[in-house]
Amino acid sequence: MSGLKHLRNRVKSIKSTQKITKAMQLVSAAKLRRIKDRAEALDDYSSILTNIMNDVKLNINFMNLSPFEQKFFNEDIKGKPHLCVVMTSERGLCGSFNSQIIKAVKRDIVKYQEQNVKVKLIIAGKKGYDAIKSQYSDLIEEYYHITKEHYLPVALEIKNKIISLTDQDKIDSCSMYYNEFKNALVQVMTKVSIFPVETLNISEQKENSKLPDSSFEYEGSNLVSSLIDLYVIGMIKHAFLQNKAS
């Protein structure tokens, strides 16, 4: 009888665990849908800004821009360090989520150094910081802890840091590393150039543009600087949401 009672309790425990697991799956699926929807909405916004920045690059006279603004469009400006913005997670147990990014960053650091280009690092996420600091602590300009839900203040701080370093003429180019979400099982390690802005080919312009006509005059002393500000924060928020979804 004791054996039968133990078996009944065991069955009851398993059923209870199954219910809890099912509830957790439903909650996780709902969270993923929300994050995915937000990421997709921001994709459109980022695409529009990228297309406008590309249009500025192709049509504006660099001589009319400030030294700060020129760095975002003129690929010939060189001599200062390259800034790498590294997006990782706070915790482990993510498979190759962090390791792919860390390997890519370390590989690029070596490549830049071989070309006699100095490197500065901005790292978001404890796993990236822990993996990089032992070897490249002297390159780390800033490290940001990512709170569980409120990534926006961190994104704003990173944007301000990038703008500040550029305005102070401490860097002349910047790239960002993060994971692009594809589906619940697949994410792709992605490296993008924040600046100088990469020139899009015709097919990319058509794919990215949500504007009926992007040919217009850029007037006003602060218009380009304001556009740069929106563009940089848009890129960073996009990377954060893609990482979160992944």
Residue spans for each PLM region:
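C-terminal beta-strand-loop-alpha-helix "lid" module of Rossmann-like NAD(P)-dependent dehydrogenases
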Residues: 1-246
